[in-house]
Swiss-Prot record:
Keywords, ordered alphabetically: Chaperone, Cytoplasm, Disulfide bond, Redox-active center, Zinc
Name by which UniProt lists this protein: 33 kDa chaperonin
Keyword Amino-acid biosynthesis listed: no
Provenance organism: Desulfotalea psychrophila (strain LSv54 / DSM 12343)
Lineage, uppermost ranks: Bacteria, Pseudomonadati, Thermodesulfobacteriota, Desulfobulbia, Desulfobulbales
One Gene Ontology cellular component: cytoplasm
Gene name, Swiss-Prot/TrEMBL: hslO
Coiled coil stretches, renumbered: none
């Protein structure tokens, strides 16, 4: 079954909801990055969160989430677009911590002090950038806090990852609910009560519930309608041309030193782990082009 995202809006237009099943793409990301259990859950939550936030964008826009805490997992970066692609990486994929109350200590892995930085490319000359402090380091609450404080849109975010003992992901998904301005405090309180009594996201997915069914539970008695669906996938936008541009950015002198010392270059994409090889003649061609420009 392919991953999917569903959008709904209340009939009065005051509340917008998104839910997604990201089980396959999170498994793909974990496979590519060869992550341990702690990193699998943290990266899975971050990818799912970026998918949900990416669904708020339009057209060719995209966003990047960067979690920079003081925990052993290090930096986590994820990117997503409104058409359903995402990619990401985690700095220390094999970092581990003792269980906390019988559960993986994701907050400890991310670190209790740090920042969430959001960068959006919305087609303007300058990219939009916003930041907020990590409030729980559980990722979902941090995204909700960012949306509520930095973007001034009251939001609730739920993320769930169910890890199999063999290291694969049994279920992954999440939801994002936003109260559109002007905020309806009574409606928000009603939905918060519903959310507090819901089963976990991962358990609903394991029970075979679709994103639409999850949204129906979230909205409860609030009349709402579906506004669209998107298929989701883990997809990297790297290319040999982009990696060549990375080499070009080093400059002719540094490339000449690299050619002398190693005779070739390997450039690894952090997001998908694909390795791009540049032979000595490739490096020399780049150096010659740079010298002709100068």
């Amino acid at each position: 079954m392919s991953d999917i995202l569903t959008r709904v809006i209340s009939e009065n237009g005051k509340t917008f909801g998104i839910a997604c099943d990201t089980t396959a793409l999170v498994n793909e990301a974990c496979r590519k990055h060869d992550v341990g259990p702690l990193a699998a859950v943290a990266l899975g939550r971050a990818l799912t969160g970026s998918i949900l936030m990416g669904a708020l964008l339009k057209g060719d826009q995209y966003l990047q989430l960067k979690f920079e805490g003081n925990g052993p997992l290090g930096k986590i970066i994820t990117e997503a677009s409104p058409d359903g692609w995402c990619r990401g990486y985690i700095a220390n994929p094999h970092a581990e911590l003792p269980l906390l109350n019988g559960r993986l200590d994701v907050a400890g892995g991310v670190g209790h002090a740090g920042l969430l930085s959001v960068t959006k490319d919305i087609g303007m000359k300058q990219k939009y950038q916003g930041t907020s402090h990590l409030v729980s380091s559980e990722i979902g609450e941090d995204i909700a806090y960012y949306l509520t404080t930095s973007e001034q849109v009251p939001s609730a975010v739920g993320l769930g990852i169910q890890l199999n003992p063999n290291g694969t992901i049994d279920a992954a998904g999440g939801f994002l609910i936003q109260s559109l301005p002007p905020a309806d405090e009574e409606l928000i309180a009603s939905m918060e009560e519903v959310i507090a009594n819901l089963p976990s996201i991962s358990s609903m997915i394991l029970d075979g519930q679709s994103p639409r069914q999850m949204l129906d539970k979230l909205f409860g008695a609030i009349p709402h309608k579906e506004t669209g669906n998107s298929k989701l996938k883990y997809q990297c936008s790297c290319s040999r041309e982009k990696m060549e541009n990375a080499l070009i950015s080093l400059g002719a002198a540094d490339l000449a030193s690299l050619l002398t010392e190693r005779g070739e270059a390997e450039v690894l994409c952090e997001f998908c782990r694909q390795n791009y090889h540049f032979a000595g003649k490739d490096l020399q061609e780049i150096i010659d082009r740079l010298k002709n420009i100068q």
